[in-house]
Amino acid sequence: MFGEKVPSSEFINRSEYRDKVLGCWTGKNIGGTLGAPMEGRREIFDVKFYVQDLKGKPAPNDDLDLQLIWLLAVEENGIYQVNERVLGEYWLSHITGPWNEYGVGKVNMANGLVPPLSGAFNNEQWKNSNGAWIRSEIWACLFPGAPDDALEFAWCDACVDHADDGIYAELFTTALESAAFVESDIRKLIDIALAKIPADCRVARSVGIAIREYEAGHDFKTARNAVVEDLSLIHI
């Protein structure tokens, strides 16, 4: 079903790189600000513009803030001195969020369980949650067009407070985002990212369903419902 597995080897110049990083960060800001008032709710919304009074400023967003902490770790240590334990130390020193998987990972680390144990122990409820893949862009931006290199750091990142599909989700998005610096074909990007995660994991299964629905000509709501229905069957 899935085709090409490697990105283009096209060279990216400094100007193009800067433009894509700016687009990545700005787009993330826009999406996070648009969705912030609806976070935690499960119904489908039809949002065409901001619903809050922003006074010209984006909403606070941990999806972005966490990535700035990772960038700080890279700047202070050098990229190849950063690993899961270093990221765990920066988490304890700089990140205050106590909720869900963030809180579990932080409590585990405070009690001496270093990553990757911090993301797996006593975390059955949240280990597959979305707190890791939402902070994956930084690794793609640091390794543009080099998904395999980016994945090493995405794993170190995700295992601080996730396990299993919570990690696979970040690997998927990181690979896709890194390859997107040199490849524009969306289907090729999806194929590249799928090749980096287990074919039988929930992330790959859900992406496959979304592709199937798209190829059948169904709209995004139908595709979304098909994914949700499949996940509900898994949990029965």
PLM features: what roles do these ranges have?
Residues P58-L87, W91, I95:
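Aromatic-rich carbohydrate-recognition surfaces in CAZymes
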Residues G78-E84, V182-L189, D219:
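Short, charged, surface-exposed loops that flank catalytic or proteolytic processing sites
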Residues E89-D200, V207-Y214:
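Amphipathic alpha-helical interface segments
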